Amino acid sequence: MISYPFFSLSPPGLVPPPMAVPPVEMYSGSFWNRMRKPLPLRTQVIRFTVVFVIVSFILAVALQITHERMPDPKVTKPLPDLGFELLTKISFLSVVTDVLIAFLSSLSFFTLWKLYLLHRHCVGSGEPELPCNIPGVSRFFLSVWLCKENCRIELRNVHTIAWIRFITSYALLLLFRSLVIVMTSMPTPVDKCQNPPKIENPVKNVILTVLTAGGGSIHCGDLMYSGHTVILTLHLMFHWIYGAMVHWSFRPVVTVVAIFGYYCIVASRSHYTDDVLVAIYLTIATFIAVGHNADGAPWQLQLFIRWLPCCGANSREVTEDSQPVMVAFKSEAVDELRERDDSAGLSCEVSTNEV
């Protein structure tokens, strides 16, 4: 065998095999600049909402797997829990938790509507009008509410950015929960799951889980961490930041409702105390990490939706919610023409350009 010096690339006349060379632009600054360029806010709203629906189906499948893997309640008893020892068991409070979540969801949509009105007021669009004026009702729903003491955020597109922040945080938390509930199966303390029903139609159960947010489907054993606590805390964070911009009372009201909801979850034995505590921490940390940004979601999250072939454009051809501005150009030549026309009894009209 012929040996070559260590510094020899190849023997004379030997052509090395072709190698796949990645495009230069993949490693260039221009490529990553394009990847970090923010998507239009409208595109983010649509695509992140689609992603949330997909994540909801993933969670529904995970709930079904967890239901089948749950330890037999007749063999494995619930784990010792300090919250269960301190709080008296009140089973019907699980229904109260759902009512509290429905109330906070309605309040959040109302706040989002008021944020949209603030955006319209900021861009000079004015208040919308109903086809028929209803005394009191029209003023309540269509008037602009603003608490200046708590308003430290740019009002333009605030409703869109708030929705993107909420829905991306919720999708991340549900996706992580889908993984966690499948990994470790714990004995359930829930009364209705002590004799868990058999799932006869898995596909129907998955669809019902998505359509009813879990209320109309069969699922047991999804303990770590609490989904009810996630949505309660998300509403709490949403109103702590954005609700306070609309009215000062939203912060204390939502805080009291959320704390009472945590109590209902533990007192009804729907979750262990650790399920609630971990969910509170993860939700607050995720909401803060996503943050409020004029470009919408962090660019790392936008990478996951940039490749979708539908649901909006990837570039901002026109500035969103832009308003036409009239600019008048004045020059000495125009002044001279105006003086000549005035002296001749003619009128000279200064042209304006819309940019």
From Swiss-Prot:
Signal peptide positions on this chain: none
Bilayer topology term: Multi-pass membrane protein
List of catalytic residues: H228, H271, D275
GO CC field: endoplasmic reticulum membrane; Golgi membrane; membrane; plasma membrane
Membrane-side (Cytoplasmic) residue stretches: 1-44, 111-165, 227-251, 297-355
MF-aspect GO terms: ceramide cholinephosphotransferase activity; kinase activity; sphingomyelin synthase activity
Protein origin, superkingdom: Eukaryota
Compartment(s) where it occurs, according to its Swiss-Prot or TrEMBL record: Membrane
Top-level EC class: transferase
Keywords: Kinase, Lipid metabolism, Membrane, Sphingolipid metabolism, Transferase, Transmembrane, Transmembrane helix
EC number(s) reported in the record: 2.7.8.-
Spans through the membrane: 45-65, 90-110, 166-186, 206-226, 252-272, 276-296
Stretches in topological domain Extracellular: 66-89, 187-205, 273-275
Pfam families hit by this protein: PAP2_C (PF14360)
Main location: membrane
GO biological process: ceramide biosynthetic process; sphingomyelin biosynthetic process
Record keyword Transferase present: yes
Summary of the function given for this chain in its UniProt record: Bidirectional lipid inositolphosphotransferase capable of converting phosphatidylinositol (PI) and ceramide to inositol-phosphorylceramide (IPC) and diacylglycerol (DAG) and vice versa. Direction is dependent on the relative concentrations of DAG and ceramide as phosphoinositol acceptors. Does not function strictly as a SM synthase. Essential for viability of the pathogenic bloodstream stage of this human protozoan parasite and, consequently, can be considered as potential drug target.
Entries under PANTHER family matching the protein: SPHINGOMYELIN SYNTHASE-RELATED PROTEIN 1 (PTHR21290:SF25), SPHINGOMYELIN SYNTHETASE (PTHR21290)
Homology family: Belongs to the sphingomyelin synthase family.
Protein name: Phosphatidylinositol:ceramide inositolphosphotransferase
